[in-house]
Amino acid sequence: MSSYYNKGDAPSWEALDQDGLDDVIDTSEYAYASRDHILFCIDAAQSMHKPYPDTTDESGQLVRGRSALHQALDVAQQIQRAKVLSGPDDSVGLLLYNVDPSAVAEDPGNYQPGNYVFQTLRTINAEEMKRLVKLMQTAKEQYEAQDDDETVETTEPEILRKTFPPIEESHEMNIANVIQTCNFLFRDGGTQLRGNKRVFWITDNDMPPGMNNRQPARTSYGDLTTYGVTAETFFIDRPDHRFNPNIFWNDILDREAIDYNDDQPDPEGLSSLADLMKDLVIKTSPKRTHFHVPLKLGKDGEIVIGVSGCSMVSEQGKGASRYVKMRGQVVEEVQSKTEYTSAETGAVLKDSEIGQAYEFGNEAEVRNILEPNPWEAHVKERAKNQNAVDHVLEDDKERRQREDEGEDLEEEEEDDKKGVEKWMGKQKAALPKIVARTRLQFSNEEVSQFRSMGIEPQIKVLGFQAASQLRFQDNLKHPFFIYPNEEEYTGSTRTFAALLNSCLKYNRHALALCRLRSNHVPEFCVLIPQEEKTSSNGQEYPPGFHLIILPYKDSIRPPPKKVAEFLQSPPIATDEQINAMKAVIKRTRFKAAAYRPEIYPNPSLAYHYDQLQALAFEEDWDPEDPAKQALDKTMPLYGGMHSRAGEFMEEFNKEIENDERAVEKLAAPTKRGKAEKETTVNEWDLRNIPDMWKKGTLSQCKVQELKDWAKHYHVPLQGKTKKADIIDVVSEHLSTSEDDLAGASSKKAKK
């Protein structure tokens, strides 16, 4: 679904859809996320077929002028291609009028002769759009095939004049009949056309037939607006005439007259339609209502109102892929089904037989989790084993007491040991093998209870704080915007407005405990009030609360040590460096002095969408095509930046190079090789190398044992890798420091 809305036409609380459960798309008739139904109504008279004058580009190459009809159809095609992905539930139709009915093979049907319905108003369909795409592809090939000779007159692609032959000027259609045809097309769409219904009217004739009797046109347009359709006009200047909407169109469309000045006509003719293309091609995700929960106030939550929340920021992805099955020309989606089977029997398990388990302890010791568990044995068997264990422990305790009293129990201990071993052997043979209990199993209800801590989805206000209590670094997660919901609790809007006004009056925000959805855990949050702001264009910011989830202690980590040290005493730039950077920034700012993220689509998604379009329309996709490389709108304009600020960039770089603080210390080159694994060896884990040296058995040691001993006692091996060479180095070291090492060895032996 698309999310078209006029600038400043922000929705109010009532405009938000209240139906559905969590994470449902708002399908209301208001601005947030309604469907878009567009009917292109294009004038195909003789003047629309005339190409505009030729121009030259920056390199001096000849650029052939295109006709207004050619440009309008090209924009209509691009908008439809964009809506295949950005608004698959939207509808687009294409109506051309002032087409010669005698030269068109298709029957106009129930519509007035002279109207050519090239595409009926219906949901976006790639198969139907291929007709327009192939038409424009042929027109592009014929347009580019024209000679580059400037003396040769530019002509319109033959395919356009053949497909939409213009009617004679004396037989051009009355605008009332054209508006009536638009009305029929929208009514034929039925009740499915819910949402924004618009007609894009494109013409260059400011004095069409029907000027002397305008009442039929006014009546037809009134019927169109009654059905909820709005008209957006794109008037085209002819090369020798500037379009004047005050003559006819403003009167018919019930618009106020504008201050018309007879300036030079627009050389391109369709600048406004090009701007429209920039706005409509922007791919935006629909706004979603993420939760509907009660908001509780008072000591024990005595006051309860209903609120809904929508996400202010969400990450747009490529969408989930689906498994499909190709059956000729039909593509069917495969229905996925997941089943769990028992590892012991292979039987399919029911949902009630599957739970969740958590592990603890050393799982590496668990060899086979399918063996019987002692906790699951019979009660009598467990009691018998426990009695035997208690008997052994009691005997051991008694024997220790007698030993403390000085009795000689060596023979008795030997007999007891043999008896215990014999008894244990019988027990092991009788009992199945068991494993350590490292898994705890819970039902889904128990896991849900653990996660929710018994708190139902709600927002419970705990108190109020001053704005000074907020810290910027606590804003880690995406915020939500909440507004009242009258669906569950009547009077929620009044109570919500009173709470909002009180917070704004005293400059306070609410501290709350929230659990926004049934699969969420309880979290602390703050409700920051937002005051309604309006302008001449309407509502700029709606009233409500921004819900910001606060982090737990485990979610906060200190910055790296080097970063913390840098922030404590950062190097300060000199005045010369600051002035040089000011000059660079001044010449590389955005023209609008503001960053508009909506005009910079994600390059990865842009490539993904374009490839999907190519697949849908059976087109080749060449990544080396300049048009495909231009999809990345985030690529910096290096040429323009260097031309405007290149001199100042060089000056800034010189200032940095002359600063002694910016000198970097280069590390000495190191040989490439397999890095030795750094290990810490305990002294008690080392082999007794001195004793083995005295006995002449060093050759029995492993190379790694010799290296560990040499590393621990800081004996340089001088790059020796062979065992014989290492033994020679160790022997030489021991022979020179035999006394010291002997003392160390004796100390180790005593311990």
Swiss-Prot record:
Isomerase listed as a keyword: no
CDD domains: KU70 (cd00788)
UniProt keyword RNA-binding present: no
Segments forming a coiled coil: none
InterPro entries in the cross-refs: Ku70, Ku70/Ku80_beta-barrel_dom, KU70_core_dom, Ku_C, Ku_N, SAP_dom_sf, SPOC-like_C_dom_sf, vWFA_dom_sf
Biased segments, Basic and acidic residues type: 391-403
SUPFAM superfamilies with a match to the protein in the record: SAP domain, SPOC domain-like, vWA-like
Catalysed reactions listed for this entry: ATP + H2O = ADP + phosphate + H(+)
UniProt keyword annotations, A-Z: ATP-binding, Chromosome, DNA damage, DNA recombination, DNA repair, DNA-binding, Helicase, Hydrolase, Nucleotide-binding, Nucleus, Telomere
Gene Ontology BP annotations: DNA recombination; double-strand break repair via nonhomologous end joining; telomere maintenance
Location (main, coarse): nucleus
Acidic residues bias (residue ranges): 404-415
EC numbers for this chain: 3.6.4.12
PANTHER family (UniProt xref): KU AUTOANTIGEN DNA HELICASE (PTHR12604), X-RAY REPAIR CROSS-COMPLEMENTING PROTEIN 6 (PTHR12604:SF2)
Annotated family: Belongs to the ku70 family.
Subunit structure: Heterodimer of Ku70 and Ku80.
Role description: Single-stranded DNA-dependent ATP-dependent helicase. Involved in non-homologous end joining (NHEJ) DNA double strand break repair. DNA-binding is sequence-independent but has a high affinity to nicks in double-stranded DNA and to the ends of duplex DNA. Binds to naturally occurring chromosomal ends, and therefore provides chromosomal end protection. Required also for telomere recombination to repair telomeric ends in the absence of telomerase. KU70, of the KU70/KU80 heterodimer, binds to the stem loop of TLC1, the RNA component of telomerase. Involved in telomere maintenance.
Protein name: ATP-dependent DNA helicase II subunit 1
Organism per entry: Cryptococcus neoformans var. neoformans serotype D (strain JEC21 / ATCC MYA-565) (Filobasidiella neoformans)
Gene of this entry: KU70
